[in-house]
Amino acid sequence: MYAIVRAGGRQEKVSVDDVVTIDRVAKEAGDTLNLEPLLVVDNGKVVSDAAELNKYQVTAEVLGEVTGPKIKILKYKSKTGYKRRLGHRQKYTQIRVTGIAAK
């Protein structure tokens, strides 16, 4: 059984016990997170109807917060000597899917 869920503006394919990195969510480590399923596949049966999906719930446990790779930004204007160098590291939340079940 697996599900496609919406997490942080993106779609992720998850199954039970998967560890997934999603955009940052304001939750502490150990908290429970409920994700919205967009599609559920259960033993070859595909469920994508909105009325049927309301019967399913995907739960996950928050493992912690991690940072992504550093992105380097350089602004430059020719003939003026203007240079500006910036860096950014995006924060992500790591979760473990604990269950995909009907309500």
Swiss-Prot record:
Record's keyword terms, sorted: Ribonucleoprotein, Ribosomal protein, RNA-binding, rRNA-binding
GO cellular component, one term: ribonucleoprotein complex
Gene Ontology MF: a single term: structural constituent of ribosome
BP GO annotations: translation
UniProt entry tagged with the keyword Ribosomal protein: yes
Function statement: This protein binds to 23S rRNA in the presence of protein L20.
Alphabetized NCBIfam families for the sequence: L21
Protein family according to the UniProt entry: Belongs to the bacterial ribosomal protein bL21 family.
Subunit: Part of the 50S ribosomal subunit. Contacts protein L20.
UniProt-recorded name of the protein: Large ribosomal subunit protein bL21
Species the sequence originates in: Thermobifida fusca (strain YX)
